[in-house]
């Protein structure tokens, strides 16, 4: 019983599965059938007749025929074949050949995709043929009107084109001939061939229109603008030469003639329709004419500058030469008393030579002006250069004069400083002698003698017949530093000697009861009287006394410096 039930269940499951697959395939077939029917309707709406009525020929007709052939293949072969395949798939599903049915469904879907794409290409191809026909009809009307306007322009403005008119008319005639050929092809329906002719027509027509726009202004400059300017230049040149103007390069008249020839050459280029070459030639002519104007104007402007600056340069030059003469006299006087170390005399002579050269050029320019042979631009350049040179010379003269003007004052100050050094070293000597010391340390004596000899040398050099103030100044700087060091050494010597004496006296109270103080006193006394090492003597006795009486050295030291400061303040008061 259970086995029978199991068989029934399996049979039901298998039946349900078969029905499910059949339902799925039927659904897919219905969807694909709908697509196929839609494509059939779409194919029926494709308007081949409209394009056939255009009366195409040549390559355009071949394109139409190819599109018609493709459409017939879709309608007569491909779409009916899809219908048959869908019927076969339904039969396969009924016979439980589900795998075959599934694979064939995919093939049919792919075939429909291909048909859809092919139909789209056919529609696009037909539209392109229709568009080409419309565009060419429009081009025929547009170009015909354009050529009429061009011919009107050439007829009404033929004088504006000069020698170019004949070739412009020839080009227009050629374009009209090509246009007639294009019109014939377009009317005959051979739009492929017509399109090639149209492309060339557009290019050539654009070139002609550009030439028609560019030539009139070029020709106008050549027949009126430039000749008028050359006439003005020639007249201006004659007037300037009559007023005794001269130019750096006497090439204005030849250049005017050369420009007239350049104008003729450019007109010939226009006659050959070499418009770009003629345009470039006009730019070159314009620059050359502008240059001639600039040359003439430069001389006119330069004359105004020369008239204004001639007297100024003369006065400036005279002033500089007088200043240099006075400076040379002053340097000769100072050289009798001082050594001039910075080449002042030689530099002043060089300045004098520069002034002579400036004067020579200036006089030559004045002569040229007087004899009416002046090139004013050259003279104006000379004046500008001379003004800069004279300013530089004046600055150097001032610097030289400033450098030597203080020599006398520096000498006087050096004498005063020498006297102060002499007074100070004698004061130091008296200060040390008043200490009544048994002697002085050798290093101190040596340094004192060095400073004393430096002062003696300075005294000797400053009283020479010819003084080298640079050397005197260097000596003053050295002595100033050495004198400061000597004062410091003297102060240290005095402090050590006086405090050593005070501590030796103070130590007497401890010598009897303290043997170390007794020994230190003997050693300190020996250093004081025999070797004159007062600093060491102070150190020895101070160390010993501080051991038996801590703080005693500090008290004596503080008292000493307090008294020293009080004495200094009293002296200053």
Curated annotation (Swiss-Prot):
Negative regulator of FtsZ ring formation; modulates the frequency and position of FtsZ ring formation. Inhibits FtsZ ring formation at polar sites. Interacts either with FtsZ or with one of its binding partners to promote depolymerization. It is found in: Cell membrane. HAMAP family: EzrA. The keyword Nucleus does not apply. Residues 22-573 are cytoplasmic. Residues 1-2 are extracellular. The chain crosses the membrane at residues 3-21. Pfam families: EzrA (PF06160). This is Septation ring formation regulator EzrA. Keywords: Cell cycle, Cell division, Cell membrane, Coiled coil, Membrane, Septation, Transmembrane, Transmembrane helix. It is a single-pass membrane protein. The keyword Ribosomal protein does not apply. One of its GO terms (biological process) is septin ring assembly. InterPro entries: EzrA. Its main location: membrane. It comes from the Bacteria. GO terms for cellular component: plasma membrane; septin ring.
């Amino acid at each position: 019983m259970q086995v029978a039930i199991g068989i029934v269940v399996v049979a039901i499951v298998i039946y349900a599965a078969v029905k499910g697959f059949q339902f799925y395939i039927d659904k897919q077939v219905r969807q694909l059938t709908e697509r196929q029917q839609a494509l059939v309707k779409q194919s029926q709406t494709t308007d081949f007749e409209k394009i056939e009525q255009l009366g195409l020929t040549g390559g355009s007709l071949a394109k139409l025929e190819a599109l018609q052939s493709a459409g017939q293949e879709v309608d007569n072969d491909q779409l009916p074949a899809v219908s048959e395949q869908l019927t076969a798939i339904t039969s396969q599903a009924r016979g439980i050949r589900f795998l075959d049915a599934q694979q064939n469904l995919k093939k049919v879907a792919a075939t429909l995709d291909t048909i859809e794409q092919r139909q789209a290409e056919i529609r696009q191809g037909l539209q392109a043929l229709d568009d080409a026909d419309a565009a060419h009809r429009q081009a025929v009307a547009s170009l015909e009107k354009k050529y009429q306007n061009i011919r009107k322009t050439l007829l009404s403005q033929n004088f504006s084109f000069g020698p170019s008119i004949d070739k412009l008319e020839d080009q227009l005639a050629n374009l009209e001939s090509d246009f007639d050929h294009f019109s014939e092809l377009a009317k005959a329906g051979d739009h492929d061939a017509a399109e090639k002719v149209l492309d060339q027509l557009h290019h050539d027509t654009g070139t002609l229109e550009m030439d028609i726009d560019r030539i009139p202004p070029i020709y106008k400059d050549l027949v009126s603008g430039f000749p008028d300017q050359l006439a003005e230049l020639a007249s201006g040149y004659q007037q300037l030469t009559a007023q005794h103007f001269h130019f750096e390069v006497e090439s204005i008249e030849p250049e005017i003639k050369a420009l007239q020839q350049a104008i003729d050459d450019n007109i010939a280029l226009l006659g050959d329709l070499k418009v770009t070459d003629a345009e470039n030639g006009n730019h070159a002519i314009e620059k050359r004419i502008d240059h001639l104007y600039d040359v003439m104007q430069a001389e006119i402007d330069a004359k105004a500058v020369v008239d204004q600056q001639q007297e100024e340069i003369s006065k400036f030059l005279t002033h500089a030469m007088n200043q240099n003469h006075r400076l040379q006299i002053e340097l000769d006087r100072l050289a009798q008393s001082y050594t001039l170390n910075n080449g002042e005399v030689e530099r002043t002579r060089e300045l004098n030579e520069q002034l002579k050269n400036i004067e020579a050029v200036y006089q030559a320019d004045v002569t040229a002006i007087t004899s009416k042979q002046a090139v004013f631009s050259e003279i104006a350049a000379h004046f500008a250069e001379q003004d800069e040179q004279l300013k530089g010379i004046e600055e150097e003269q001032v610097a030289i004069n400033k450098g030597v003007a203080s020599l006398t004052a520096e000498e006087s100050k050096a004498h005063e400083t020498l006297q102060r050094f002499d007074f100070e070293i004698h004061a130091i000597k008296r200060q040390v002698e008043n200490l009544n010391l048994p002697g002085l340390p050798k290093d101190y004596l040596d340094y004192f003698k060095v400073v004393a000899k430096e002062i003696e040398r300075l005294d000797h050099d400053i009283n020479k017949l010819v003084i080298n103030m640079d050397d005197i100044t260097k000596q003053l700087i050295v002595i100033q530093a050495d004198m400061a060091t000597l004062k410091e050494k003297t102060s240290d010597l005095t402090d050590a000697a006086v405090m050593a004496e005070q501590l030796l006296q103070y130590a007497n109270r401890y010598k009897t009861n303290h043997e170390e103080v007794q020994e230190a006193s003997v050693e300190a006394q020996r250093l004081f009287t025999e070797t004159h090492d007062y600093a060491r003597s102070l150190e020895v006795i101070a160390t010993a006394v501080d051991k038996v009486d801590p703080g005693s050295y500090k008290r004596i030291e503080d008292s000493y410096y307090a008294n020293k400061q009080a004495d200094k303040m009293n002296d200053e008061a």
